[in-house]
């Protein structure tokens, strides 16, 4: 397990605010939901605000796990992934919070730090509940952003950045083997999955076997739910939690978008998707969304009810794939 989860205080973050803005920090509030980094709203003495990201062991709730395919699907954390993904997405014209400060010195706080623009319009998830009519054009703009990202392609899968590695075998084989590992882990914990483990393993192998390797891959966010989209003062969508971005079969993204946006997915849909890839990635995705939350709950993450709900929902989705 990573560190002891000692969150930072206003006093701890004064030097960060001073370095970023040249002003005194009035208060620092840790925002909820982060599992791999600390997210803090920094309120300055003039009333303006910024957002601080802190990466260190104490802010990371995830138990360490071996992953032989780190180039493509591994848990995404760290300032270098953030910087590379932020740059890559911004170059497509898609809005991400502006960067105010990057500090890797560990002099300001015990960890790597980024300070970014505070987009105060709230999340798209909340907007769809609070004002569905206002959310509709934001969703359409988000669809355009998704398509702009997908249009940025390259010949090898993996994370962005000059030093990023790529898998040495077809992406669908990487996804299959990862899903089989997730299935094995989940079957040890969930009797309903254990009872049909062989059928699920067979379905993964069969769905993967019909896929032909691809020569180009599109840019995806990786975890693009409405909670990872903020809305700015002009009702433009702003993508956050971008560290998982990379080049991959775009069907992986759309399997996730279908799940997270539900009846509003049509705003984000694109033509020409490979239906066989979608079918394969849906099953792999549901297994990952059981394994991940259950593994996170091996530690001290405080949002336990929410993670259990995600796992339970995706257990049902996984079993439904056998119908």
Each model region followed by its residue ranges:
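Conserved catalytic motifs of the protein kinase core domain
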Residues: 47, 111, 215-217, 235
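An alpha-helical support segment within catalytic cores of ATP-dependent transferases
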Residues: 8-24, 104-107, 130-140, 147-220, ...
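ATP/Mg2+ or Mg2+-diphosphate-binding catalytic cores
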Residues: 185-189, 195, 289-323
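Charged, low-complexity intrinsically disordered tails and linkers
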Residues: 2-45, 152
